């Protein structure tokens, strides 16, 4: 597992190698919103195209707490944001109501849904 500083170094190296030839989306998910915000701000500073985050994988949070976590990240930068739903690893499956709420934010540009089985995505 990488530290926040190591993750910053990796993100910077990827962006430098990608230049403007590729879209760079930096995953900023951490157990704490504070560290996620730190990574999101760094992603913005290196010129990343977007940020993405899962809910906390350690703490099993209710939807309103996940919403606060994601909104804290979103509000910390001008980067577009991609919700990452991977319930088999996080213990949190994005409820449709929260998805609808989050989708109203113009910075939310998409969702990476790794839910299994994949046909469950039809609900979104």
Positions of predicted regions on the chain:
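Active-site beta->alpha loop and helix N-cap motifs at the rims of alpha/beta catalytic domains
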Residues: 1-93, 99
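Catalytic alpha/beta core domains of metabolic enzymes, predominantly
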Residues: 74-76, 87-124
């Amino acid at each position: 597992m990488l530290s926040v500083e190591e993750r910053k170094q990796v993100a910077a190296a990827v962006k430098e190698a990608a230049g403007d030839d590729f879209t760079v989306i930096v995953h900023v998910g951490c157990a704490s919103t504070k560290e996620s915000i730190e990574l999101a701000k760094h992603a913005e500073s290196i010129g990343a195209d977007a940020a993405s985050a899962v809910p906390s994988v350690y703490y099993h949070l209710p939807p309103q707490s996940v919403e606060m976590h994601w909104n804290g990240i979103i509000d910390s930068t001008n980067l577009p944001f991609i919700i990452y739903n991977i319930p088999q690893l996080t213990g949190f499956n994005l409820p449709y109501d929260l998805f609808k709420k989050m989708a109203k934010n113009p910075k939310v540009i998409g969702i990476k849904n790794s839910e299994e089985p994949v046909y469950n995505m039809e609900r979104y």
